[in-house]
A protein has these predicted regions:
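A translation/RNA-centric and nucleic-acid-associated enzymatic feature enriched
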Residues: 1-107
Length: 107
């Protein structure tokens, strides 16, 4: 599985994660991505190790699971891509209020 360590795996198909993407047409691509989150601390640690990460670097995250985690899911929405799609803009930079380029990193 080449997914983020915090995504829960499908119990019936462990090679898959319980995740989704909302894809907009017209060449825009992914507008929303989400997943059910893994709550089992040992599964999360194993996933981190499988991805070559040091679990000690994620203690803050592991603590959030260790002390009161509940089953939950989450998602992220790309506002610029959503605006690009709704407004039928040709390029995403036209939807970004303060676009960054290699030559311009400050508004």
């Amino acid at each position: 599985v080449s997914q983020a360590f915090y995504k829960a795996r499908d119990p019936k198909h462990p090679d898959l994660v319980l995740a989704f993407d909302v894809i907009a047409g017209d060449g825009v691509g992914e507008v929303v991505g989400g997943s059910e989150r893994e709550t089992d601390l040992e599964v999360i640690k194993k996933s981190l190790l499988e991805q070559g990460e040091d679990p000690r670097s994620y203690e803050w995250y592991l603590d959030s699971r260790r002390y009161g985690s509940v089953q939950h899911a989450g998602f992220g929405m790309g506002m610029e891509r959503l605006i690009q799609w709704i407004c039928k803009l040709e390029h995403i930079r036209d939807a970004v209020p303060f676009p960054r380029t290699p030559a311009r990193s400050y508004p």
